[in-house]
Amino acid sequence: MGTDGAGHVARSTIRPYSETLNVTRDGAPMRTFLHTADGVAIDSVYEPGGVVYDSGKVVYERVGEGARNGSGNALSGVSQGLVFVIAHGFTGDADRPHVRRVARVFARYGAVVTFSFRGHGRSGGRSTVGDREVLDLAAAVAWARELGHTRVVTVGFSMGGSVVLRHAALDAGGVDAVVSVSAPARWFYRGTAPMRRLHWLVTRPSGRLVGRYGLRTRIHHRQWDPVPLSPVEAVPRIAPTPLLVVHGDQDTYFPLDHPRMLADAAGEHGELWVEHGMGHAENAAPEPLLRRIGDWAVARAG
């Protein structure tokens, strides 16, 4: 989708809109809009470790020029350490209950950045279903670095799981560990009923209307041109960055040949966890699994 694929990851400019920037200087969460390399505004939330974000209790402040243009730290005394950048699945957003649940668990292990992909939630633009979303993730990772974090772990679910793989492959050295949950290995898969419905949603005008008004997801009408690097093609390029692939054996979207293809492509630098009884993506990820992922991330990148 779009006239050119996100074939590389440019360093995104961090330009919060000052009138909507939520930042407090006492270690509380903050919320802002980031600008991607192609100019899309991405709604993003930062939570210091151990702090739970509550969208009903935010404080909006203006900040100095350094924070607006990405040339200075928006907070004084931000902890130098591990941060999780969470990439949600298709039709999710930063305020969805399951995304917030994931963030709460990972906040026990480090700081957390959540954001809404383009076309989702409060973010601008239209969804390209995993293509240019790599630029959205790049902006969020750059923001985490700007805030002073020295170790970044990206955790993606479903569409977000494919995005974290491509981002790590295209931006060598940009992250310290990668976790991909419920991701496809290859594009254009239609082997399950949910994926056939998703393709109708994305490719048909009536489907995109359902996406906009029923699922709060604005989907781009253009097809991919060129087709982006597939997840299974991206995985070998991630090494030596540690990679964890997680998949449920009850996933109704992508059967187990997908994670096994990813694990085979990863070789010795990747790990595969097949979770008994788990369905698809963040909605199905139980808290004990999320804690195990947190432990894994700390051991590899912390």
Regions found by a protein language model. Give the residues of each.
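N-terminal cap/lid segment of alpha/beta-hydrolase-fold proteins
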Residues: 4-68, 72-77
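The serine-hydrolase catalytic nucleophile loop
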Residues: 90-103
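Conserved alpha/beta-hydrolase
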Residues: 103-124
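Alpha/beta-hydrolase active-site loop
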Residues: 128-147
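Hydrolase active-site cap/lid region
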Residues: 173-224
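Short beta-strand/loop motif that positions the catalytic acidic residue
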Residues: 238-239, 245-247
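Conserved alpha/beta-hydrolase "acid-adjacent" motif
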Residues: 252-258
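Catalytic histidine-centered segment of alpha/beta-hydrolase-like enzymes
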Residues: 278-289
